[in-house]
Amino acid sequence: RLDVVIRNAINNGQIPGPRYLAASQEITVPGGLGDETLPHLPFPEFSFGVNVNGAEDMRKSVRMFLKYGVDSIKINLSGDNFVPGADSHTAWMTDAEVAAAVEEVKMRGKRIIVHARSKASIQQALRHGIELIYHASFTDTETLDMMEAAKDRIFVVPGIGILYALLNESEQWGITREIATG
């Protein structure tokens, strides 16, 4: 993991840099956000995300990244509108998979981060005690109430830059406003 190498080099004074937390590769499910595996490419480790199938697979992946020395584990609970078949309103992981990730991360005193745009994925993150939620884009009154009840322990990162770019600068790449708004 390059993140770990860079963080260690900064901390050891080998290169100048800010305080830096090394993150895992994104953990996803087959067909979810970050799954870029293709049947003709035999190297799944080159995919943007690591695929898991079930709680034990999740546990294995999380342990592997923690062994490598990451500071945080990122899991993708929902999709995104620019991902065919995995739009923003989805919630991909089972509660057992999320619980396994949270248990392993908390046991080792690390952070867990989630990509959660759909209300179901935001609620799932909150139910499992996840403190750092990226996006939280599509919500409702119930979800907002849950977030407010947890306001002293959660941090929401809306990721405004990507939303702006999707709406205003992505058409040349085939992402129309209709696709971007879901």
What is each stretch, according to the model?
Residues 1-16, 49-74, 103:
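Alpha-helical scaffold segments that flank or form the walls of functional sites
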Residues 37-61, 107, 111-113, 181:
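Active-site mouth loops of central-metabolism enzymes
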Residues 30, 76-182:
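Active-site core of metal-dependent hydrolases
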